[in-house]
């Protein structure tokens, strides 16, 4: 979850990884549900302020006719220095939809607006237990 609409800290380490010859795998472009219309599961460890900021971003995307899931996966695969982004779904239709989203051009103006909505919750992370 380190190259997503709400947290792009991974870019801070790309030069180091490249110097060391380390390939990078990004995962969880939907930030474990933060960046989805479905919302986060109860067990999600993100702080409440981040959950709320992502909900507002999702609502805004929906008001623009652009599902946040689409923007989230497009953003997560947009950096050519990150060769792989993993996502999962139990629903084959969602897998196909995500592949379709990846092939479509990203709306960078909407990315900027979503990052503005997320605001000071950008790059906020949580403790893993």
Q: For the regions a protein language model found, what residue spans apply to each?
A:
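Beta/alpha (TIM)-barrel catalytic core signal, keyed to glycine-rich beta->alpha loops juxtaposed to Asp/Glu
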Residues: 1-128
